[in-house]
């Protein structure tokens, strides 16, 4: 079953895959990384003017990484705004996704956090860098195949 947005994307020849609906009835769509930036601009023009959240996760050890976007269509006088969830899957060997910072500025720190924790590189992000881990940190702590470094902090006994 396709939702309203999925039907609209099909009507306009925009390639995607419907992943169904969540428990709240919010449609989830899968977009290819190479199509993401152009579809993001189209969604913004279509009325999805608010990036509610962006997060990322490791699908399986040695498997794909996912970047997830929750978009909302805010309009004056509407009690129940329309929402959509977008998922983009990338290979962990070279995880690159176009940044949507230039579409929704609120993606700034969210994309930085996904980079810092999972190593997903957001192309054309103006200041992509680590924000939680030290710049010298090696590896991506939230990947399921991450091996924690074996170090101990020595503290004073006083």
Swiss-Prot record:
Record Pfam families: Complex1_30kDa
Keyword Ribosomal protein: no
GO CC list: chloroplast thylakoid membrane
UniProt-listed Enzyme Commission number(s): 7.1.1.-
Any Gene Ontology biological process: photosynthesis, light reaction
Catalytic activity line of the entry: a plastoquinone + NADH + (n+1) H(+)(in) = a plastoquinol + NAD(+) + n H(+)(out); a plastoquinone + NADPH + (n+1) H(+)(in) = a plastoquinol + NADP(+) + n H(+)(out)
Entry's localization field: Plastid, Chloroplast thylakoid membrane
Keywords associated with the record: Chloroplast, Membrane, NAD, NADP, Plastid, Plastoquinone, Quinone, Thylakoid, Translocase, Transport
Membrane topology: Peripheral membrane protein
GO MF annotation: an example: NADH dehydrogenase (ubiquinone) activity
Its job: NDH shuttles electrons from NAD(P)H:plastoquinone, via FMN and iron-sulfur (Fe-S) centers, to quinones in the photosynthetic chain and possibly in a chloroplast respiratory chain. The immediate electron acceptor for the enzyme in this species is believed to be plastoquinone. Couples the redox reaction to proton translocation, and thus conserves the redox energy in a proton gradient.
Subunit structure: NDH is composed of at least 16 different subunits, 5 of which are encoded in the nucleus.
Family to which this protein belongs: Belongs to the complex I 30 kDa subunit family.
Full protein name: NAD(P)H-quinone oxidoreductase subunit J, chloroplastic
Lineage of the organism: Eukaryota, Viridiplantae, Streptophyta, Embryophyta, Tracheophyta
